[in-house]
Regions:
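N-terminal maturation segment of proteins
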Residues: 52-610
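C-terminal motif of bacterial Sec signal peptides marking the signal peptidase cleavage site
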Residues: 47-50
Length: 610
Protein backbone atom coordinates (compact mmCIF):
# COMPACT_ATOMS: atom_id res chain seq x y z
CA UNK A 1 0.00 0.00 0.00
CA UNK A 2 1.26 3.56 -0.57
CA UNK A 3 2.65 5.15 2.51
CA UNK A 4 3.91 8.40 3.79
CA UNK A 5 4.61 8.95 7.44
CA UNK A 6 2.95 6.55 9.79
CA UNK A 7 0.06 7.45 11.97
CA UNK A 8 -2.96 6.22 13.81
CA UNK A 9 -6.02 8.45 13.65
CA UNK A 10 -9.34 8.15 15.36
CA UNK A 11 -12.45 10.29 15.35
CA UNK A 12 -14.73 10.68 18.32
CA UNK A 13 -17.94 12.49 19.11
CA UNK A 14 -19.37 13.57 22.43
CA UNK A 15 -23.20 13.36 22.22
CA UNK A 16 -24.21 16.81 21.03
CA UNK A 17 -20.75 18.13 20.23
CA UNK A 18 -19.17 16.54 17.19
CA UNK A 19 -15.42 16.34 17.60
CA UNK A 20 -12.55 14.83 15.69
CA UNK A 21 -10.33 13.27 18.27
CA UNK A 22 -7.03 11.95 17.00
CA UNK A 23 -4.64 9.68 18.70
CA UNK A 24 -1.99 10.74 16.24
CA UNK A 25 0.99 8.53 16.88
CA UNK A 26 3.63 10.39 14.95
CA UNK A 27 6.05 7.57 15.37
CA UNK A 28 6.83 7.56 11.68
CA UNK A 29 6.99 3.84 11.92
CA UNK A 30 4.56 0.90 12.04
CA UNK A 31 2.80 -0.13 8.85
CA UNK A 32 6.00 0.46 6.89
CA UNK A 33 6.69 -3.15 6.00
CA UNK A 34 5.90 -3.91 2.38
CA UNK A 35 4.84 -0.42 1.52
CA UNK A 36 6.78 1.56 -1.04
CA UNK A 37 9.92 0.34 0.68
CA UNK A 38 9.04 -3.28 -0.02
CA UNK A 39 12.16 -3.84 -2.07
CA UNK A 40 14.21 -3.32 1.08
CA UNK A 41 12.69 -6.51 2.47
CA UNK A 42 14.01 -8.55 -0.41
CA UNK A 43 17.61 -8.43 0.74
CA UNK A 44 17.17 -9.93 4.22
CA UNK A 45 14.53 -12.30 2.92
CA UNK A 46 16.77 -13.72 0.23
CA UNK A 47 20.03 -13.64 2.13
CA UNK A 48 18.85 -14.92 5.47
CA UNK A 49 15.99 -17.08 4.31
CA UNK A 50 18.18 -19.61 2.57
CA UNK A 51 21.53 -19.13 4.24
CA UNK A 52 23.18 -21.94 6.15
CA UNK A 53 23.74 -20.21 9.47
CA UNK A 54 23.37 -23.54 11.19
CA UNK A 55 21.11 -24.70 13.97
CA UNK A 56 24.00 -24.39 16.42
CA UNK A 57 23.12 -20.75 16.87
CA UNK A 58 19.76 -21.78 18.22
CA UNK A 59 16.54 -21.11 16.42
CA UNK A 60 15.67 -18.11 18.58
CA UNK A 61 18.99 -16.42 17.84
CA UNK A 62 18.68 -17.09 14.11
CA UNK A 63 15.17 -15.73 14.06
CA UNK A 64 16.10 -12.58 15.98
CA UNK A 65 19.02 -12.03 13.63
CA UNK A 66 16.63 -12.22 10.72
CA UNK A 67 14.05 -9.85 12.20
CA UNK A 68 16.77 -7.38 13.17
CA UNK A 69 17.94 -7.29 9.56
CA UNK A 70 14.39 -6.70 8.33
CA UNK A 71 13.93 -3.93 10.89
CA UNK A 72 17.18 -2.17 9.98
CA UNK A 73 16.51 -2.40 6.25
CA UNK A 74 13.04 -0.95 6.61
CA UNK A 75 13.68 1.99 8.93
CA UNK A 76 16.79 3.07 7.04
CA UNK A 77 14.86 3.49 3.79
CA UNK A 78 13.99 7.12 4.61
CA UNK A 79 15.12 9.69 7.14
CA UNK A 80 11.76 10.30 8.76
CA UNK A 81 11.19 6.64 9.57
CA UNK A 82 14.71 6.32 10.94
CA UNK A 83 14.73 9.46 13.06
CA UNK A 84 11.32 8.89 14.59
CA UNK A 85 12.12 5.24 15.37
CA UNK A 86 15.68 5.44 16.73
CA UNK A 87 17.49 8.17 18.60
CA UNK A 88 20.82 6.33 18.24
CA UNK A 89 20.68 4.34 14.99
CA UNK A 90 24.41 3.71 15.10
CA UNK A 91 23.81 1.17 17.88
CA UNK A 92 21.91 -0.85 15.28
CA UNK A 93 24.69 -0.48 12.74
CA UNK A 94 22.77 2.13 10.76
CA UNK A 95 24.79 5.11 9.56
CA UNK A 96 21.99 7.09 7.98
CA UNK A 97 19.09 7.19 5.56
CA UNK A 98 18.05 9.19 2.49
CA UNK A 99 16.70 12.61 3.48
CA UNK A 100 13.20 11.97 2.16
CA UNK A 101 9.72 11.39 3.58
CA UNK A 102 9.10 8.33 1.45
CA UNK A 103 7.12 7.88 -1.72
CA UNK A 104 3.83 6.59 -3.06
CA UNK A 105 3.63 3.50 -5.22
CA UNK A 106 1.07 1.54 -7.17
CA UNK A 107 3.46 -1.33 -7.92
CA UNK A 108 1.41 -4.21 -6.56
CA UNK A 109 3.70 -6.75 -8.23
CA UNK A 110 6.67 -5.47 -6.21
CA UNK A 111 4.73 -5.74 -2.98
CA UNK A 112 3.53 -9.25 -3.72
CA UNK A 113 7.03 -10.36 -4.69
CA UNK A 114 8.40 -9.02 -1.42
CA UNK A 115 5.67 -10.83 0.48
CA UNK A 116 6.43 -14.10 -1.23
CA UNK A 117 10.14 -13.75 -0.50
CA UNK A 118 9.52 -13.09 3.17
CA UNK A 119 7.03 -15.94 3.42
CA UNK A 120 9.70 -18.21 2.00
CA UNK A 121 12.20 -16.85 4.50
CA UNK A 122 9.88 -17.65 7.40
CA UNK A 123 9.61 -21.29 6.38
CA UNK A 124 13.35 -21.65 7.05
CA UNK A 125 12.68 -21.39 10.81
CA UNK A 126 11.34 -24.16 13.01
CA UNK A 127 8.29 -22.56 14.61
CA UNK A 128 8.05 -25.11 17.42
CA UNK A 129 11.64 -24.38 18.48
CA UNK A 130 10.99 -20.66 19.01
CA UNK A 131 10.26 -19.18 22.42
CA UNK A 132 6.93 -17.50 23.08
CA UNK A 133 8.03 -13.96 22.17
CA UNK A 134 9.47 -15.12 18.86
CA UNK A 135 6.38 -17.21 18.10
CA UNK A 136 4.25 -14.10 18.59
CA UNK A 137 6.52 -12.17 16.23
CA UNK A 138 6.41 -15.02 13.71
CA UNK A 139 2.61 -15.11 13.84
CA UNK A 140 2.44 -11.34 13.39
CA UNK A 141 4.81 -11.43 10.43
CA UNK A 142 2.74 -14.17 8.84
CA UNK A 143 -0.48 -12.23 9.43
CA UNK A 144 0.98 -9.00 8.11
CA UNK A 145 2.37 -10.56 4.96
CA UNK A 146 -1.03 -12.03 4.13
CA UNK A 147 -2.65 -8.64 4.78
CA UNK A 148 -0.09 -6.84 2.62
CA UNK A 149 -0.66 -9.23 -0.27
CA UNK A 150 -4.39 -8.66 0.00
CA UNK A 151 -3.93 -4.87 0.16
CA UNK A 152 -1.76 -4.90 -2.97
CA UNK A 153 -4.87 -5.41 -5.09
CA UNK A 154 -6.42 -2.18 -3.81
CA UNK A 155 -3.56 0.33 -3.77
CA UNK A 156 -5.49 3.09 -5.51
CA UNK A 157 -8.39 2.78 -3.06
CA UNK A 158 -6.19 4.22 -0.30
CA UNK A 159 -6.51 7.94 0.46
CA UNK A 160 -3.38 9.71 1.74
CA UNK A 161 -5.29 13.01 1.79
CA UNK A 162 -7.72 11.82 4.45
CA UNK A 163 -9.89 14.43 6.10
CA UNK A 164 -8.58 13.61 9.57
CA UNK A 165 -5.33 11.80 8.95
CA UNK A 166 -4.14 13.33 5.72
CA UNK A 167 -0.64 14.29 4.71
CA UNK A 168 -1.79 17.91 4.39
CA UNK A 169 -2.43 18.23 8.15
CA UNK A 170 0.17 15.87 9.53
CA UNK A 171 3.31 16.74 7.61
CA UNK A 172 3.75 20.06 9.49
CA UNK A 173 3.34 18.28 12.83
CA UNK A 174 5.97 15.74 11.82
CA UNK A 175 8.36 18.55 10.95
CA UNK A 176 7.62 20.52 14.12
CA UNK A 177 8.38 17.51 16.35
CA UNK A 178 11.54 16.39 14.54
CA UNK A 179 14.02 16.31 17.42
CA UNK A 180 17.45 17.94 17.23
CA UNK A 181 19.97 15.91 19.20
CA UNK A 182 23.01 17.41 17.46
CA UNK A 183 24.17 19.52 14.52
CA UNK A 184 23.72 16.63 12.11
CA UNK A 185 20.02 16.46 12.90
CA UNK A 186 19.61 20.13 11.97
CA UNK A 187 21.37 19.56 8.66
CA UNK A 188 19.22 16.49 7.97
CA UNK A 189 16.06 18.39 8.83
CA UNK A 190 16.85 21.14 6.34
CA UNK A 191 17.51 18.52 3.65
CA UNK A 192 14.19 16.93 4.53
CA UNK A 193 12.40 20.25 4.08
CA UNK A 194 14.14 20.62 0.75
CA UNK A 195 12.69 17.27 -0.33
CA UNK A 196 9.09 18.33 0.40
CA UNK A 197 8.28 19.31 -3.23
CA UNK A 198 9.39 15.90 -4.51
CA UNK A 199 7.31 14.15 -1.87
CA UNK A 200 4.23 16.22 -2.68
CA UNK A 201 4.81 15.62 -6.41
CA UNK A 202 4.78 11.88 -5.71
CA UNK A 203 1.54 12.32 -3.79
CA UNK A 204 -0.03 14.33 -6.60
CA UNK A 205 0.97 11.71 -9.15
CA UNK A 206 -0.71 9.09 -6.98
CA UNK A 207 -3.88 11.21 -6.78
CA UNK A 208 -3.86 11.62 -10.57
CA UNK A 209 -3.75 7.85 -10.95
CA UNK A 210 -6.67 7.58 -8.54
CA UNK A 211 -8.54 10.10 -10.66
CA UNK A 212 -7.85 8.19 -13.88
CA UNK A 213 -9.22 5.06 -12.21
CA UNK A 214 -12.38 6.87 -11.13
CA UNK A 215 -11.35 6.69 -7.48
CA UNK A 216 -10.67 10.34 -6.65
CA UNK A 217 -12.30 11.74 -3.53
CA UNK A 218 -15.77 13.29 -3.37
CA UNK A 219 -16.12 17.01 -4.06
CA UNK A 220 -16.88 17.90 -0.44
CA UNK A 221 -13.76 16.02 0.67
CA UNK A 222 -11.68 17.92 -1.88
CA UNK A 223 -13.10 21.18 -0.52
CA UNK A 224 -11.97 20.22 2.98
CA UNK A 225 -8.46 19.37 1.78
CA UNK A 226 -8.30 22.70 -0.03
CA UNK A 227 -9.38 24.52 3.14
CA UNK A 228 -6.72 22.71 5.18
CA UNK A 229 -3.96 23.57 2.71
CA UNK A 230 -5.15 27.18 2.58
CA UNK A 231 -5.14 27.45 6.37
CA UNK A 232 -1.53 26.29 6.47
CA UNK A 233 -0.47 28.74 3.77
CA UNK A 234 -2.33 31.64 5.37
CA UNK A 235 -0.26 31.30 8.53
CA UNK A 236 2.57 32.99 6.64
CA UNK A 237 5.38 34.28 8.85
CA UNK A 238 3.41 33.22 11.92
CA UNK A 239 3.66 29.55 11.00
CA UNK A 240 4.67 27.38 13.94
CA UNK A 241 7.39 25.75 11.82
CA UNK A 242 9.37 28.96 12.32
CA UNK A 243 8.95 29.19 16.09
CA UNK A 244 9.36 25.48 16.81
CA UNK A 245 12.58 25.41 14.81
CA UNK A 246 13.99 28.29 16.85
CA UNK A 247 12.93 26.61 20.09
CA UNK A 248 14.57 23.32 19.18
CA UNK A 249 17.81 24.81 17.97
CA UNK A 250 18.12 26.98 21.07
CA UNK A 251 18.82 23.85 23.11
CA UNK A 252 21.87 22.78 21.10
CA UNK A 253 24.87 23.90 23.14
CA UNK A 254 27.34 22.76 20.50
CA UNK A 255 26.21 25.59 18.22
CA UNK A 256 27.37 29.18 18.52
CA UNK A 257 24.81 31.97 18.48
CA UNK A 258 25.95 32.90 14.99
CA UNK A 259 25.45 29.33 13.77
CA UNK A 260 22.00 29.21 15.31
CA UNK A 261 21.10 32.45 13.56
CA UNK A 262 22.35 31.08 10.24
CA UNK A 263 20.30 27.91 10.64
CA UNK A 264 17.20 29.92 11.48
CA UNK A 265 17.68 31.83 8.23
CA UNK A 266 18.15 28.53 6.36
CA UNK A 267 14.90 27.22 7.83
CA UNK A 268 13.05 30.34 6.72
CA UNK A 269 14.50 29.92 3.24
CA UNK A 270 13.34 26.28 3.09
CA UNK A 271 9.85 27.34 4.15
CA UNK A 272 9.67 30.00 1.45
CA UNK A 273 11.34 28.03 -1.34
CA UNK A 274 10.17 24.46 -0.64
CA UNK A 275 7.42 23.88 1.90
CA UNK A 276 5.03 26.69 1.00
CA UNK A 277 5.42 26.15 -2.77
CA UNK A 278 4.76 22.42 -2.25
CA UNK A 279 1.50 23.21 -0.47
CA UNK A 280 0.52 25.68 -3.19
CA UNK A 281 1.15 22.96 -5.78
CA UNK A 282 -0.90 20.46 -3.80
CA UNK A 283 -3.77 22.90 -3.38
CA UNK A 284 -3.80 23.63 -7.12
CA UNK A 285 -3.71 19.92 -7.97
CA UNK A 286 -6.67 19.11 -5.73
CA UNK A 287 -8.62 22.02 -7.23
CA UNK A 288 -7.82 20.67 -10.69
CA UNK A 289 -8.81 17.09 -9.85
CA UNK A 290 -11.95 18.06 -7.99
CA UNK A 291 -15.09 16.77 -9.70
CA UNK A 292 -13.24 13.84 -11.28
CA UNK A 293 -14.37 11.54 -8.49
CA UNK A 294 -17.24 9.28 -9.51
CA UNK A 295 -18.65 8.37 -6.10
CA UNK A 296 -19.99 10.60 -3.34
CA UNK A 297 -21.30 7.72 -1.24
CA UNK A 298 -19.92 4.66 0.56
CA UNK A 299 -17.23 2.29 -0.66
CA UNK A 300 -19.77 -0.36 -1.62
CA UNK A 301 -20.70 1.79 -4.63
CA UNK A 302 -17.20 1.44 -6.11
CA UNK A 303 -16.14 -1.53 -8.26
CA UNK A 304 -15.14 -4.25 -5.77
CA UNK A 305 -15.84 -1.65 -3.09
CA UNK A 306 -17.63 -4.05 -0.78
CA UNK A 307 -14.73 -6.52 -0.85
CA UNK A 308 -12.30 -3.66 -0.24
CA UNK A 309 -14.29 -2.47 2.77
CA UNK A 310 -14.35 -6.00 4.20
CA UNK A 311 -10.56 -5.97 3.97
CA UNK A 312 -10.39 -2.52 5.58
CA UNK A 313 -12.54 -3.74 8.46
CA UNK A 314 -10.40 -6.84 9.05
CA UNK A 315 -7.17 -4.88 9.01
CA UNK A 316 -8.35 -1.84 10.95
CA UNK A 317 -10.00 -3.84 13.73
CA UNK A 318 -7.60 -6.78 13.92
CA UNK A 319 -10.50 -9.23 13.99
CA UNK A 320 -11.60 -11.96 11.60
CA UNK A 321 -15.29 -11.37 12.28
CA UNK A 322 -17.44 -10.41 9.31
CA UNK A 323 -19.05 -6.99 8.99
CA UNK A 324 -22.43 -8.49 9.88
CA UNK A 325 -20.95 -10.15 12.97
CA UNK A 326 -19.43 -6.84 14.04
CA UNK A 327 -22.76 -5.10 13.55
CA UNK A 328 -24.34 -7.67 15.86
CA UNK A 329 -21.49 -7.24 18.37
CA UNK A 330 -22.03 -3.48 18.47
CA UNK A 331 -25.77 -3.86 18.95
CA UNK A 332 -25.29 -6.35 21.79
CA UNK A 333 -22.92 -3.94 23.51
CA UNK A 334 -25.44 -1.12 23.12
CA UNK A 335 -28.07 -3.26 24.85
CA UNK A 336 -25.64 -4.11 27.64
CA UNK A 337 -24.77 -0.43 28.12
CA UNK A 338 -28.43 0.63 28.10
CA UNK A 339 -29.29 -1.98 30.71
CA UNK A 340 -26.49 -0.66 32.92
CA UNK A 341 -27.84 2.88 32.58
CA UNK A 342 -31.41 1.80 33.29
CA UNK A 343 -30.33 0.05 36.49
CA UNK A 344 -29.31 3.39 38.00
CA UNK A 345 -32.08 5.18 39.87
CA UNK A 346 -32.27 8.57 41.52
CA UNK A 347 -30.10 10.43 39.03
CA UNK A 348 -30.47 11.46 35.40
CA UNK A 349 -27.87 11.64 32.67
CA UNK A 350 -28.49 15.38 32.37
CA UNK A 351 -27.71 15.89 36.05
CA UNK A 352 -24.54 13.85 35.71
CA UNK A 353 -23.48 15.93 32.69
CA UNK A 354 -24.03 19.17 34.60
CA UNK A 355 -21.82 17.92 37.43
CA UNK A 356 -19.14 16.69 35.03
CA UNK A 357 -19.00 19.98 33.13
CA UNK A 358 -17.63 21.77 36.18
CA UNK A 359 -15.52 19.19 37.98
CA UNK A 360 -12.79 21.71 38.69
CA UNK A 361 -10.32 19.71 36.62
CA UNK A 362 -8.89 22.06 34.02
CA UNK A 363 -5.12 21.81 34.48
CA UNK A 364 -3.72 19.20 32.09
CA UNK A 365 -0.55 18.51 34.09
CA UNK A 366 -2.50 18.03 37.31
CA UNK A 367 -4.99 15.72 35.62
CA UNK A 368 -2.19 13.59 34.20
CA UNK A 369 -0.59 13.41 37.63
CA UNK A 370 -3.89 12.28 39.15
CA UNK A 371 -4.34 9.69 36.43
CA UNK A 372 -0.86 8.28 37.08
CA UNK A 373 -1.76 7.78 40.71
CA UNK A 374 -5.31 6.64 40.06
CA UNK A 375 -4.41 3.72 37.80
CA UNK A 376 -1.89 2.12 40.17
CA UNK A 377 -4.41 -0.29 41.74
CA UNK A 378 -5.70 -1.81 38.49
CA UNK A 379 -2.82 -1.42 36.04
CA UNK A 380 0.73 -2.81 36.24
CA UNK A 381 3.75 -0.64 36.94
CA UNK A 382 5.48 0.96 33.99
CA UNK A 383 8.97 2.44 33.46
CA UNK A 384 9.52 6.00 34.67
CA UNK A 385 9.03 8.52 31.93
CA UNK A 386 8.86 12.25 31.36
CA UNK A 387 5.92 13.99 29.74
CA UNK A 388 5.56 17.42 28.19
CA UNK A 389 2.15 18.89 27.42
CA UNK A 390 2.06 21.20 24.41
CA UNK A 391 -0.78 23.15 22.85
CA UNK A 392 -1.95 23.24 19.25
CA UNK A 393 -1.17 26.61 17.60
CA UNK A 394 -4.27 28.79 17.54
CA UNK A 395 -4.17 29.15 13.77
CA UNK A 396 -4.47 25.37 13.35
CA UNK A 397 -7.02 24.65 16.09
CA UNK A 398 -9.85 24.32 13.58
CA UNK A 399 -7.95 21.79 11.48
CA UNK A 400 -6.16 19.66 14.07
CA UNK A 401 -7.54 17.26 16.63
CA UNK A 402 -8.56 17.90 20.23
CA UNK A 403 -5.48 15.99 21.36
CA UNK A 404 -2.75 13.70 20.08
CA UNK A 405 0.22 11.76 21.42
CA UNK A 406 3.59 11.66 19.71
CA UNK A 407 5.16 8.21 19.86
CA UNK A 408 8.79 8.51 21.00
CA UNK A 409 11.73 6.69 19.46
CA UNK A 410 11.91 3.12 20.76
CA UNK A 411 15.28 3.83 22.39
CA UNK A 412 14.09 7.11 23.90
CA UNK A 413 10.74 6.39 25.57
CA UNK A 414 11.71 8.66 28.47
CA UNK A 415 10.59 11.66 26.40
CA UNK A 416 6.88 11.93 25.58
CA UNK A 417 4.69 14.71 24.20
CA UNK A 418 0.92 15.16 24.27
CA UNK A 419 -0.69 17.99 22.30
CA UNK A 420 -3.92 19.59 23.53
CA UNK A 421 -6.23 21.59 21.29
CA UNK A 422 -7.74 24.01 23.79
CA UNK A 423 -10.42 25.21 21.39
CA UNK A 424 -11.99 21.76 21.27
CA UNK A 425 -11.90 20.63 24.88
CA UNK A 426 -15.48 21.58 25.67
CA UNK A 427 -15.62 20.92 29.41
CA UNK A 428 -13.62 19.46 32.29
CA UNK A 429 -14.79 15.90 31.70
CA UNK A 430 -13.78 16.05 28.04
CA UNK A 431 -10.29 17.17 29.03
CA UNK A 432 -10.01 14.50 31.73
CA UNK A 433 -11.08 11.57 29.56
CA UNK A 434 -9.08 12.85 26.59
CA UNK A 435 -5.91 12.93 28.68
CA UNK A 436 -6.65 9.41 29.88
CA UNK A 437 -6.98 8.34 26.24
CA UNK A 438 -3.73 9.99 25.20
CA UNK A 439 -1.78 9.55 28.42
CA UNK A 440 -2.54 7.30 31.39
CA UNK A 441 -3.59 4.54 31.02
CA UNK A 442 -3.97 5.18 27.27
CA UNK A 443 -1.51 5.59 24.44
CA UNK A 444 1.47 6.89 26.40
CA UNK A 445 1.13 4.26 29.12
CA UNK A 446 0.62 1.42 26.63
CA UNK A 447 3.60 2.52 24.54
CA UNK A 448 5.99 2.93 27.46
CA UNK A 449 4.86 -0.30 29.15
CA UNK A 450 5.25 -2.34 25.97
CA UNK A 451 8.67 -0.92 25.08
CA UNK A 452 9.69 -1.72 28.66
CA UNK A 453 9.20 -5.43 27.91
CA UNK A 454 12.10 -5.23 25.41
CA UNK A 455 10.13 -6.46 22.39
CA UNK A 456 11.63 -7.44 19.06
CA UNK A 457 12.25 -4.10 17.28
CA UNK A 458 10.67 -5.44 14.09
CA UNK A 459 7.27 -5.27 15.75
CA UNK A 460 7.50 -1.49 15.65
CA UNK A 461 7.07 -1.69 11.88
CA UNK A 462 3.50 -2.87 12.16
CA UNK A 463 0.27 -1.00 12.73
CA UNK A 464 -2.57 -2.67 14.62
CA UNK A 465 -5.08 0.11 15.04
CA UNK A 466 -7.72 -2.13 16.57
CA UNK A 467 -5.41 -2.98 19.45
CA UNK A 468 -3.80 0.45 19.90
CA UNK A 469 -6.92 2.56 19.49
CA UNK A 470 -9.08 -0.03 21.19
CA UNK A 471 -6.82 0.04 24.23
CA UNK A 472 -6.84 3.84 24.36
CA UNK A 473 -10.64 3.87 24.15
CA UNK A 474 -10.81 1.20 26.86
CA UNK A 475 -8.52 3.40 28.97
CA UNK A 476 -10.72 6.41 28.31
CA UNK A 477 -13.80 4.51 29.44
CA UNK A 478 -12.02 3.36 32.60
CA UNK A 479 -11.10 6.96 33.41
CA UNK A 480 -14.71 7.97 34.06
CA UNK A 481 -14.43 6.05 37.32
CA UNK A 482 -11.30 8.00 38.31
CA UNK A 483 -13.09 11.36 38.21
CA UNK A 484 -14.64 13.04 41.27
CA UNK A 485 -18.04 11.86 40.02
CA UNK A 486 -20.05 9.32 41.98
CA UNK A 487 -20.00 5.77 40.65
CA UNK A 488 -23.58 6.20 39.44
CA UNK A 489 -22.79 9.45 37.62
CA UNK A 490 -19.65 7.96 36.08
CA UNK A 491 -21.56 4.89 34.92
CA UNK A 492 -24.26 6.95 33.22
CA UNK A 493 -21.76 9.10 31.35
CA UNK A 494 -19.39 6.28 30.44
CA UNK A 495 -22.12 4.03 29.09
CA UNK A 496 -23.57 6.97 27.18
CA UNK A 497 -20.17 7.65 25.60
CA UNK A 498 -19.85 3.98 24.69
CA UNK A 499 -23.28 3.96 23.04
CA UNK A 500 -22.51 7.06 20.98
CA UNK A 501 -19.28 5.48 19.83
CA UNK A 502 -21.22 2.37 18.84
CA UNK A 503 -23.62 4.45 16.76
CA UNK A 504 -20.76 5.91 14.75
CA UNK A 505 -19.30 2.46 14.23
CA UNK A 506 -22.67 1.17 13.03
CA UNK A 507 -22.98 4.20 10.74
CA UNK A 508 -19.52 3.45 9.31
CA UNK A 509 -20.63 -0.08 8.42
CA UNK A 510 -24.03 1.12 7.26
CA UNK A 511 -22.61 3.72 4.89
CA UNK A 512 -19.73 1.71 3.44
CA UNK A 513 -21.16 -1.82 3.52
CA UNK A 514 -24.95 -1.49 3.51
CA UNK A 515 -24.94 1.52 1.18
CA UNK A 516 -26.74 4.06 3.35
CA UNK A 517 -27.56 7.39 1.76
CA UNK A 518 -27.38 10.67 3.65
CA UNK A 519 -31.06 10.37 4.43
CA UNK A 520 -30.55 6.83 5.71
CA UNK A 521 -27.91 8.18 8.09
CA UNK A 522 -30.24 10.96 9.22
CA UNK A 523 -32.99 8.42 9.92
CA UNK A 524 -30.61 6.13 11.80
CA UNK A 525 -29.30 8.82 14.13
CA UNK A 526 -32.73 10.33 14.68
CA UNK A 527 -33.83 6.99 16.14
CA UNK A 528 -31.32 7.62 18.92
CA UNK A 529 -32.19 11.25 19.52
CA UNK A 530 -29.43 12.78 17.39
CA UNK A 531 -31.44 15.08 15.16
CA UNK A 532 -29.18 18.05 14.39
CA UNK A 533 -28.86 17.99 10.60
CA UNK A 534 -25.46 19.72 10.47
CA UNK A 535 -23.98 17.28 12.97
CA UNK A 536 -25.20 14.24 11.03
CA UNK A 537 -23.94 15.81 7.80
CA UNK A 538 -20.44 16.20 9.25
CA UNK A 539 -20.50 12.67 10.60
CA UNK A 540 -21.55 11.31 7.21
CA UNK A 541 -18.83 13.18 5.33
CA UNK A 542 -16.13 12.25 7.82
CA UNK A 543 -17.10 8.58 7.59
CA UNK A 544 -17.02 8.78 3.78
CA UNK A 545 -13.52 10.27 3.96
CA UNK A 546 -12.18 7.82 6.57
CA UNK A 547 -13.60 4.32 5.99
CA UNK A 548 -13.24 2.04 9.01
CA UNK A 549 -11.84 4.81 11.15
CA UNK A 550 -14.45 4.52 13.90
CA UNK A 551 -14.24 0.75 13.92
CA UNK A 552 -10.64 0.43 14.97
CA UNK A 553 -11.26 2.12 18.27
CA UNK A 554 -14.86 1.10 19.01
CA UNK A 555 -14.56 -2.52 17.88
CA UNK A 556 -11.08 -2.61 19.39
CA UNK A 557 -12.51 -1.36 22.68
CA UNK A 558 -15.25 -4.00 22.65
CA UNK A 559 -12.69 -6.70 21.84
CA UNK A 560 -10.83 -5.80 25.03
CA UNK A 561 -14.13 -6.06 26.92
CA UNK A 562 -14.69 -9.50 25.38
CA UNK A 563 -11.19 -10.62 26.37
CA UNK A 564 -11.82 -9.40 29.92
CA UNK A 565 -15.08 -11.37 30.09
CA UNK A 566 -13.18 -14.46 28.97
CA UNK A 567 -10.54 -13.81 31.65
CA UNK A 568 -13.24 -13.46 34.32
CA UNK A 569 -14.91 -16.72 33.25
CA UNK A 570 -11.61 -18.56 33.46
CA UNK A 571 -10.25 -17.00 36.65
CA UNK A 572 -13.59 -16.72 38.51
CA UNK A 573 -12.94 -15.55 42.09
CA UNK A 574 -9.21 -15.30 41.31
CA UNK A 575 -9.84 -12.61 38.70
CA UNK A 576 -7.44 -9.67 38.90
CA UNK A 577 -7.79 -6.61 36.68
CA UNK A 578 -4.11 -5.89 37.08
CA UNK A 579 -3.12 -9.38 35.88
CA UNK A 580 -5.47 -9.14 32.92
CA UNK A 581 -4.09 -5.76 31.93
CA UNK A 582 -0.52 -6.99 32.32
CA UNK A 583 -1.23 -9.98 30.09
CA UNK A 584 -2.75 -8.10 27.15
CA UNK A 585 -0.21 -5.28 27.42
CA UNK A 586 2.71 -7.70 27.44
CA UNK A 587 1.50 -9.46 24.30
CA UNK A 588 1.52 -6.01 22.74
CA UNK A 589 -0.07 -4.67 19.55
CA UNK A 590 -1.34 -7.58 17.46
CA UNK A 591 -4.50 -8.98 15.89
CA UNK A 592 -6.94 -9.98 18.62
CA UNK A 593 -6.79 -13.69 17.78
CA UNK A 594 -3.08 -13.57 18.59
CA UNK A 595 -3.67 -11.56 21.77
CA UNK A 596 -6.27 -14.08 22.92
CA UNK A 597 -4.03 -17.04 22.13
CA UNK A 598 -1.00 -15.78 24.04
CA UNK A 599 -2.42 -13.72 26.91
CA UNK A 600 -2.72 -16.78 29.14
CA UNK A 601 0.93 -17.73 29.05
CA UNK A 602 2.74 -14.51 28.22
CA UNK A 603 3.23 -13.13 31.73
CA UNK A 604 4.67 -16.39 33.03
CA UNK A 605 6.94 -16.73 30.02
CA UNK A 606 7.91 -13.10 29.43
CA UNK A 607 11.35 -13.74 30.82
CA UNK A 608 12.10 -16.62 28.50
CA UNK A 609 15.51 -16.68 26.86
CA UNK A 610 15.67 -15.05 23.51
Amino acid sequence: MPFSFIHYIISFSKKDNFLKKDAFHAGMRRKRLLGAGAAACLIPALVLGGCGTGRAQGEDERFRQYTREVFCQEISSDLVSLHYTLKEPEKYGISGAPAVFGEFTVDSAQIKAACENMETALTAFSYDDLNIQNRITYDILEYYLEAAEESADYLLYDEPLGLVSGVQTQLPVILSEYQFYDRGDVEDYLKLMQSTPDYIDSLIQFERQKSEAGLFMADYAADTVIEQCSAFLEMGDGNYLYSTFSDRIAGLDELTEEEKSDYIEDNALMMEDCVYPAYQTLLAAVEELKATGQNEKGLCYLPEGKAYYEMVVRQSTGTEQTVRELEDLARRQIVEDLEAMESIVGITRGEAQETAASMGKSDAELILSELREGISAAFPEYPDTALEVKYVPEAMEEHLSPAFYMIPAIDNTQENVIYINQAQMGDDLTLFTTLAHEGFPGHLYQTVFYEGTDPDPVRNLFSFGGYVEGWATYAEMCSYYLTPLSKEQATLLQKNASIILALYALADMGIHYEGWSRMDAVAFFSNYGITDADTVERIYELIIGSPGNYLKYYIGYVQFLELKKEWVREEKEEFSQKKFHEAVLTVGPAPFDIVEEYMWEITADSGADE
